[in-house]
């Protein structure tokens, strides 16, 4: 399930584009997540009241949280699969405090892929998409394993 060096390079190349505008990308990812899977919005007390897309776009808190999410994910991706130290506190908080099911991580992974396809079509071809999908699946599988260790059935 691991990625080759070439696959990691494809992932990190497009991630460089994401880091140039973490807020914009993060906001777009969360909007796609909430619009595509409205049930996920219920996990966010800060954002539950945001029903319309224009309200979401106007929310600085949503943009800040999107930046936080993608900053954490970027730190994990840059570890090229050697992310146990970065993953542990994230799994802990998402299992015990936020209670985020693994299914929701699948949903946000889909949103990330869609945003990258939309914003960077020239840099996110089929090979890069496949590599990113694989990297996000590795992340989800490792989070799920940590959840199990913590006794969270998410």
Curated annotation (Swiss-Prot):
Top-level EC class as recorded in UniProt: oxidoreductase
At which residues is Phosphoserine found? 4
Residues engaged in binding nitrite:
65
Summarize where heme b binds, as residue positions. 94
Cite the PROSITE patterns for this sequence. GLOBIN
| InterPro entries assigned to the protein according to its UniProt record, in alphabetical order | Globin (IPR000971), Globin-like_sf (IPR009050), Myoglobin (IPR002335)
Q: In terms of one coarse class, where is the protein primarily found?
A: cytoplasm
Residues with the modification Phosphothreonine, per the entry, are 68
What reaction does this catalyse? Answer: Fe(III)-heme b-[protein] + nitric oxide + H2O = Fe(II)-heme b-[protein] + nitrite + 2 H(+); H2O2 + AH2 = A + 2 H2O
What span is annotated as the signal peptide, if there is one?
A: none
What is one GO biological process annotated to this record? removal of superoxide radicals
* Domain annotation Globin: ranges: 2-148
Residues that bind O2, according to the entry? 65
What is the protein name given in its UniProt record?
A: Myoglobin
Q: Which organism is it from?
A: Lagostomus maximus
Gene encoding it? Answer: MB
